Amino acid sequence: MLLQIAEPGQSAVPHQHKLAVGIDLGTTNSLVASVRSGEAKTLPDMKGNVILPSVVQYQEDKICVGMNAYQSAAMDPQNTIISVKRLMGRSLKDIQARYPELPYQFSESENGLPVIQTAQGEVNPIQVSSEILKSLSRRAQDTLGGELEGVVITVPAYFDDAQRAGTKDAATLAGLNVLRLLNEPTAAAIAYGLDSGQEGVIAVYDLGGGTFDISILRLSKGVFEVLATGGDSALGGDDFDHVLAQWIKEQAGITSSLSSQEQRELLTLATQTKVALSDSDNVKISFKDWSGEISVELFNSLIQPLIKKTLMACRRALKDADITSEEVMEVVMVGGSTRTPFVRTSVGDYFGQTPLTSIDPDQVVAIGAAIQADILVGNKPDSEMLLLDVIPLSLGIETMGGLVEKIIPRNTTIPVAKAQEFTTFKDGQTGMMVHVVQGEREMVEDGRSLARFSLKGIPPMAAGAAHIRVTYQVDADGLLSVTAMEKSTGVQSHIQVKPSYGLSDNEVANMLKDSMTYAKEDMQARALAEQQVEADRVIEGLVVALNNDGDALLSKEEQAEILQAIEALITLRQGTDAQAIEDGIKKADEASQEFAARRMDASIRAALAGQSIDEV
């Protein structure tokens, strides 16, 4: 009997074409695309526009999405939500610290997540995102003439679990069946690399409105692998606007706070000026009572520090992939912000080649997502494409002494499942706390805590006798599940990791930098902690053994010798010399070897008491 195995959501009927789309849910703009007659194309609205501004306006009697909402932003800033993607998965405190100029009235929900006060009441970022997805879904179904079987939605490679889960929740709220979340740079590489059949190393430079991602990829014989990723989940073209807006404000001599409407007008002016500078050397500006002019050279100097940050992330990603810039065959430019000429020339200078821009950088991600959706829904059963994403930071578990045991190293391809066995530290231990951590450092205190859960019901045994299997599983969407199981009984506990808010600005980059900066100190701290844990085990074991069998098996002098070694080890354990502790452990072992042998003999005699030779 044969069992047909297919990707979830794939068609079991080989020649039945199903309707599936790829959605680029962007910070500034969103798009939807589909494969039609063998070609992936973005789908336009009734007016022929393929780009939908990621803007939602809440009026008392209706909700507007897209261009109409965008045009209302200056007049109704508090009810018009722009760049909601930047708020996804973040706490209210984080948002207020990061974006103090936002004109919205925020409050905190019961679970600590932000909500925005609008004319229709409170809304959260997930609900706002779902309105954008609903609009794209309606457009797709009107254009394609039928119900959608599924969608592939793209997210920045640096979105963490909370941000990815929030995106999925928004899609569910919009009534969509999510086939997969796909990293934006990966989608772009599908659109470029696989269509042209090229092989080699490719750098995907993705600078959108609110996020930056760099991915180093390898295409080889149909296998598409992400070698390394990097970036910043809070850096994009919006920051160009904010820098320019601040310059205009300073030039205009404005020192007082602006109203919500004035803030929106200023940002709109900055955006229009930025776009105009892509085609002109000088642009005239007027704001309130001030008029002036800005040159492209001055604008370039304002945004240069931001571009430099992206190039530093490129350098780190290349180092992670063990690739030099000379080995990069092509550089793919993605995201509307790469239209800025200074961005293109800066990236070209860094990699020593002219970047690829033949596919519209605004549309390339949606096109790649559409190709992937067409495969996952079952329209291309013979496709040989293999997609391998990676996790950006190592995932590990806390062990005795505050140490991190890495279970899935960073840049491991996903989906992935890895397991490791652990044991109990104390006699009779019936429970275990599992602490899931993220990061590259050796000590828990230097990493990022993701979750904690407990495993109960471990049978009472001697220390080290129980076998607990801990499994980490990261699915194709980058969501982490952790399971702990005691092997003899099968008792288990499970958790899906969903942090309450996302990584702070540059936190991923800083965590990687710190792991290199403090590598020597971390290894020394780990060596010390390991010896301290081993010393604790030896001390506890000897104390229990002496209490149980010392009087029966040892003379007073022998007991005194072992006690002296224990006391010496206790003193050494309180110090910071790992080698001295290791030497103390060896001396304690030597002092107790004869005692251990006598205990073993006594155990064997007790086990054989009353049995005949034949029975043995």
Curated annotation (Swiss-Prot):
One of its GO terms (biological process) is iron-sulfur cluster assembly. Signal peptide: none annotated. It comes from the Bacteria. InterPro entries: ATPase_NBD, Heat_shock_70_CS, HscA_NBD, HSP70_C_sf, HSP70_peptide-bd_sf, Hsp_70_fam, ISC_FeS_clus_asmbl_HscA. PROSITE patterns: HSP70_1 (PS00297), HSP70_2 (PS00329). It comes from Aliivibrio fischeri (strain MJ11) (Vibrio fischeri). The gene is hscA. Keywords: ATP-binding, Chaperone, Nucleotide-binding. NCBIfam families: HscA, PRK05183.1. This is Chaperone protein HscA homolog. One of its GO terms (molecular function) is ATP binding. Pfam families: HSP70 (PF00012).
